[in-house]
Amino acid sequence: MHAQCSGTSGEPVSPPLIAITCGEPAGIGPELCLRLPERFGAKAPFRLLVLGDRGLLAERARHLGLAVTLRDWTPENPFPSLLADTLDVLHFPLTAPAMPGRLDPANAHHVLNLLGRAVNGCMSGEFAAMVT
């Protein structure tokens, strides 16, 4: 089922796409992102897109025992529906392996790249908003 909102003309429009950056890979951001589907799922009036390292998210999901499906997202293939157990991810590879609670300066560029992509997406209208 395609989630839609009504525009001012009454015609259906796609719900807004919100970009969420995972933040520092050694921090709590990846875990918070993984909890988004259970919190919002199919009932949200918006679509969520997580910007981060897919492998890191998969590893943290396994560690937490979360049954979350990570789905690759591209601008050319946006997903029209919201699913309660699925997280759409725009993959940005880590610069260095991440250990929870241990910051690695080598991943600073990774974090800046996430923020830059989210800002550019908002400026171009691709994303309706960003959360960091």
Each language-model region and where it sits:
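Contiguous, glycine/small-aliphatic-enriched amphipathic segments in soluble metabolic enzymes
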Residues: 2-132
